[in-house]
Amino acid sequence: MSWNHNRRWKDFQALVNAEDYFAFFELPYDPRVVNVNRLHILRKFAQYLAPLEHFQGSEEEWLEQARQALEKAYQTFLTSTPQQEKLFRVFQDYGCPDPVGGCAGCSSSGERGECSPGIPA
């Protein structure tokens, strides 16, 4: 492990926001990425933590797995968007009504096929 070995489960449980998690795990991050994607990063982090619910290793091993999960969640949003990940209901039905030709939302966002719901084609 390359981070502080004195971290404990009880300290992890007291964490509140994304920045707290990054500080706890001593992971570098771009504040601009976290500011824009914080809820998505935390949701993805929670998804990666779910399989650890019945983890049988030591506390230190669990925390290392959690550290890797946060890093992986953060890395996801360096190359992907909330619309592509569809972690929240608002994005689950997200998509262009005309993915071939695009619509007003596509042309205004500059991302053909990834427009805002409710914008007429």
From Swiss-Prot:
Keyword set, alphabetical order: Nitrogen fixation
Pfam families: NifW
Disulfide bonds: none
InterPro entries attached to this UniProt entry: NifW (IPR004893)
Origin: domain of life: Bacteria
Biological process per Gene Ontology, one example term: nitrogen fixation
Coiled-coil region: none
NCBIfam families, per the entry: PRK14102.1 (NF010702)
Alphabetical list of HAMAP family matching this protein: NifW
Described purpose of this protein according to its UniProt entry: May protect the nitrogenase Fe-Mo protein from oxidative damage.
Assembly and binders: Homotrimer; associates with NifD.
Family the entry assigns: Belongs to the NifW family.
Protein name listed in UniProt: Nitrogenase-stabilizing/protective protein NifW
